[in-house]
């Protein structure tokens, strides 16, 4: 039976800060330009029309509109922004 802790226990005990990854705006939600849509590691989702990608693969809205998720085949998932419908008042 050991009477000293050994070297293993003193080298443990670290943890990393949470990164808060995932989808931030879901399909059908109305967004403004600059809103973050998805925080991700790698390109789990790809940028579609009206969506930009940051250097850490974060997807964000380039224009105002509604979020649309599109699945194209196997493993190709795109996020696009559908332009907001402008309502005209009838006289």
UniProtKB/Swiss-Prot annotation:
The gene is rpmA. Belongs to the bacterial ribosomal protein bL27 family. Binds the 5S and 23S rRNAs and also the tRNA in the P site. GO terms for biological process: translation. Pfam families: Ribosomal_L27. One of its GO terms (molecular function) is rRNA binding. This is Large ribosomal subunit protein bL27. Keywords: Ribonucleoprotein, Ribosomal protein, RNA-binding, rRNA-binding, tRNA-binding. It comes from Deinococcus radiodurans (strain ATCC 13939 / DSM 20539 / JCM 16871 / CCUG 27074 / LMG 4051 / NBRC 15346 / NCIMB 9279 / VKM B-1422 / R1). It comes from the Bacteria.
